[in-house]
Amino acid sequence: MNLLRTFNATLARRPLATQVIVSGAVCGAGDAFTQYLTGQKSWDYKRTARFTCLAAVFIAPPLNVWFRVLERVRHSNRHAQVFSRMSIDQFMFSPFFNAIILVNLRLLEGFSFSKSVDKMKNDWYDVYTSSLRLWPAVQLINFYFVPLNYRVILIQVVAFFWNSWLSFKTQTPALEDPTIE
């Protein structure tokens, strides 16, 4: 219980820093887990570092701000408020956010900006439509039950599995399209 109390106190004092650290750790663990499950001969620590950096720099800080923006969405009816937040998140923010994540992942891999955009275009539709099978339900739970400072952390706990899939999806060579390197 002391560890949980310390975590809660740290989150209350430094929400962004705590969210960044937890997000990076969970995302990196998701990639390492994927490498283990797919039977890679050796651990690609650089790949795990890229996923850790992706979450810590390009995911947690924007989500921290985004959830505070969504807090401003108000309705007199609690159900309408939660549904509005989820809808805005999934249909206005998520399409762009997924694209930004995919481009940044490729930039971290060392691809040029134009090649990163090409790769994003190749992966985006599948990633976004797959995200719609998971994240609306998660966000409904998030907006109904989870205090604001914990929302990024809940997202990253669920994202352990999502990031495992995303790592698999983006790190497996595309056999059907020889133009994508």
Curated annotation (Swiss-Prot):
<dbReference type="GO" id="GO:0005739">
    <property type="term" value="C:mitochondrion"/>
</dbReference>
<feature type="transmembrane region" description="Helical">
    <location>
        <begin position="20"/>
        <end position="38"/>
    </location>
</feature>
<comment type="similarity">
    <text>Belongs to the peroxisomal membrane protein PXMP2/4 family.</text>
</comment>
<dbReference type="GO" id="GO:1901858">
    <property type="term" value="P:regulation of mitochondrial DNA metabolic process"/>
</dbReference>
<dbReference type="Pfam" id="PF04117">
    <property type="entry name" value="Mpv17_PMP22"/>
</dbReference>
<keyword id="KW-1133">Transmembrane helix</keyword>
<dbReference type="InterPro" id="IPR007248">
    <property type="entry name" value="Mpv17_PMP22"/>
</dbReference>
<keyword id="KW-0496">Mitochondrion</keyword>
<comment type="function">
    <text>Involved in mitochondria homeostasis.</text>
</comment>
<feature type="transmembrane region" description="Helical">
    <location>
        <begin position="48"/>
        <end position="70"/>
    </location>
</feature>
<dbReference type="GO" id="GO:0005743">
    <property type="term" value="C:mitochondrial inner membrane"/>
</dbReference>
<keyword id="KW-0999">Mitochondrion inner membrane</keyword>
<keyword id="KW-0472">Membrane</keyword>
<protein>
    <recommendedName>
        <fullName>Mitochondrial inner membrane protein Mpv17</fullName>
    </recommendedName>
</protein>
<feature type="transmembrane region" description="Helical">
    <location>
        <begin position="140"/>
        <end position="162"/>
    </location>
</feature>
<dbReference type="GO" id="GO:0005737">
    <property type="term" value="C:cytoplasm"/>
</dbReference>
<feature type="transmembrane region" description="Helical">
    <location>
        <begin position="91"/>
        <end position="113"/>
    </location>
</feature>
<dbReference type="GO" id="GO:0015267">
    <property type="term" value="F:channel activity"/>
</dbReference>
<keyword id="KW-0812">Transmembrane</keyword>
